[in-house]
Design a protein with these regions (language model features):
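N-terminal signal peptide c-region/cleavage motif recognized by signal peptidases
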Residues: 14-18
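Short, solvent-exposed mixed-charge patches
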Residues: 90, 119-120
Length: 120
């Protein structure tokens, strides 16, 4: 009886705990400097299921966590995986030599995994 109860409790917990596998993942990112600002292209993979659960944005952050830019994704990409979107006009402070890219989805929020990109 104790084993059955423990197994049932663990099964319920596993269903209610978000899985890293269901979070949006950054597969690649590139940066290009143009004048005083930067353009970023970010490739994301996420098992979009429609409007109820999809990758809905990504951000460019300084190493200290300061958000430098945000790209909102306006619709699901169920049939386009992975997909790449760009953001231009991002001002990166002097002295910042790398940025951290974070993906967001409509159910899990910010992904636990980030992508660090060195700026050249």
């Amino acid at each position: 009886m104790m084993k059955t109860t423990l197994f049932a409790a663990l099964a319920v917990l596993s269903l209610s705990t978000p899985s890293v596998a269901d979070q949006a993942q950054i597969e690649n990112a590139t940066a290009t400097k143009s004048g005083n600002s930067w353009s970023f292209s970010v490739t994301i993979r996420h098992p979009d299921t429609g409007w109820d659960h999809y990758a809905d944005g990504w951000s460019i952050n300084a190493p200290d966590g300061t958000e430098l830019g945000y790209r909102k994704l306006l619709h699901p990409h169920e049939n386009e995986q992975p997909f790449t979107r760009s953001l231009a006009g991002v001002n990166v402070p002097d002295g910042v030599t790398e940025v951290v890219v974070r993906a967001h989805d409509s159910v899990h929020g910010w992904s636990d995994k980030t992508y660090t990109l060195k700026l050249n």
